[in-house]
Structures are given as structure tokens and as C-alpha cells.
């Protein structure tokens, strides 16, 4: 806030680190045109999707590299806006005591039938990756996720995406199996 009036700004306290490593806080200003919420947002499907789409195009960073997020921390941060503290990685998320639907061992048509009944915002997993289900249209099933690489439909070589994107479950992993084929679990954080 250095030498600025707070007109049309929210005044916030920012945690800072002094040169000697000690903690101090400093006032900061956030323009009123930006998203600010005092407390957690109300958990609604629309709210979850709105928060998820605010990150569209953000850079991927495995384990927080490049001051960025990977798939599990992206999902964690979206749900944190609603007061849900999810574990940092997919292994921990899979152990949460919430409603789970096993998809491993099912054929794609069975998985599609299950997905049609799920609400947007449901989390979908395959080994090493989590994504947020958006819904389906014209037999295409859509997700939003923070992804490093994938094989585009009709191609055989992986491309480095390294971004938050929307894609269908028809894209492939480097092993050339579709994401639909690879799905192992649906997790609904708001149901126990």
C-alpha cells in the first residue's frame, strides 16, 4: 500500500519474510475489480466450475515447480475456495472418506453410463492423474485438468501441454489408451 490511498481497493495483510528470515506482515491493496471473498464460497456446482475455469491456460508445474500447480494441487486449490481441504497428492485424495465409484475393470460403455449420471465437479482418476468432470455432449465426455502431456485424438505421439485445459476423455495417454479406458475411480468430495 506504499504511499497509496485505498480508494477502490481492498486492504489486506500480506505475510512477508524479513532478510533475517523472520516473519512480518505488510498491508497490501487488491483492486475491487478483482475476485475477493471474505470467508469461503458457497459450495455449488456452478461455483466449483467457475473457480476451475479461472485457471484455464495457467501453467503446469509438477510438484509446484515453476511456481505453478500440477493436477492434484490444481484440484486442491479449487476446492479450497469452498473450505474443503483436500490432500496434496492423488494418493491422499483417493484415501478420503467420501463417496467413490470404482471404474477400474469396467468397459468404456459401462464407464460412460456411470459418467452420464455424475454431477459436474466430480473428480476422475487414473494412475498418477486427477481431473474434474464437466459433463457430456454428443457422446463426448469433457474434463478440465492441469496436464503435462497427452496424445491428441487421431495422433500417436505425445504433445507437451503443460497447462490447465479442457479436453475430452477420447485423448490418449502415451501408452495410446484413451483416458476413458484408463479411468479407475470417480470421487465425489461433497458426498460421504
Report residues per predicted region:
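Glycine-rich, flexible loop segments associated with nucleotide phosphate handling
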Residues: 24, 28, 111-119, 161
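...with weaker cross-activation on analogous glycine-rich loops/strands in unrelated enzymes
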Residues: 87-155
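Aromatic- and glycine-rich peptidoglycan recognition patches
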Residues: 21-22, 34-38, 133-192
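N-terminal capping segments
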Residues: 4-104, 127, 140, 144
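Short, low-complexity Ser/Thr-rich regulatory SLiMs
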Residues: 2-3, 135
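Generic structural signal for buried aliphatic residues
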Residues: 1-2, 124
Amino acid at each position: 500500500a506504499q504511499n497509496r490511498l485505498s480508494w477502490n481497493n481492498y486492504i489486506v495483510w500480506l505475510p512477508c519474510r524479513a532478510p533475517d528470515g523472520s516473519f512480518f506482515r505488510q498491508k497490501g491493496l487488491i483492486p475491487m475489480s478483482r475476485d475477493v471473498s471474505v470467508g469461503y464460497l458457497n459450495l455449488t456446482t456452478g461455483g466449483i466450475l467457475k473457480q476451475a475455469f479461472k485457471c484455464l491456460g495457467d501453467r503446469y508445474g509438477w510438484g509446484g515447480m515453476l511456481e505453478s500447480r500440477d493436477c492434484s494441487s490444481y484440484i486442491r486449490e479449487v476446492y479450497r475456495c469452498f473450505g474443503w481441504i483436500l490432500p496434496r497428492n492423488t494418493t491422499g485424495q483417493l484415501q478420503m472418506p467420501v463417496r467413490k465409484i470404482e471404474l477400474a475393470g469396467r468397459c468404456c460403455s459401462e464407464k460412460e453410463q456411470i459418467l452420464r449420471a455424475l454431477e459436474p465437479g466430480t473428480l476422475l482418476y487414473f494412475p498418477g492423474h486427477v481431473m474434474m468432470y464437466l459433463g457430456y455432449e454428443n457422446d463426448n465426455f469433457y474434463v478440465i485438468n492441469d496436464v503435462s502431456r497427452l496424445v491428441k485424438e487421431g495422433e500417436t505421439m505425445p504433445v507437451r501441454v503443460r497447462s490447465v485445459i479442457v479436453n475430452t476423455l477420447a485423448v490418449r495417454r502415451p501408452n495410446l489408451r484413451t483416458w476413458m479406458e484408463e479411468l479407475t475411480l470417480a470421487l465425489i468430495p461433497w458426498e460421504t
